[in-house]
Amino acid sequence: MLNRQKCLLYMVELAGRPVTHLELTKWAFLLAHETPSHGGASFYDFLPYKYGPFSFALFHEADDLVRNGYLRDTKADGREAWARAAEVDARVGNMPGGLRADAARVVE
């Protein structure tokens, strides 16, 4: 599993609730552009879009995480959202410390 995928799981875990697609996209954008780690060497690229930044790769990988049973599709406040499918396993713990701290700062 890539560090950026682990980071998505970690942010959903930190939220402790279903996270809308828009929220997760904005958190990932902030992580990439406003933190010292910048999300890591191969984090998501973003394009300007209707509601702010958008990443095709982020949505593709989130769909992969749903297919592999890490996330599940749901609704939050009437909007499409992702929620944790099960407890995030130990592989998320292998995420670099700087990235983990930056992700926690963005979600809070």
Residue ranges and their predicted role:
Residues 1-108:
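Domain-edge interaction signal
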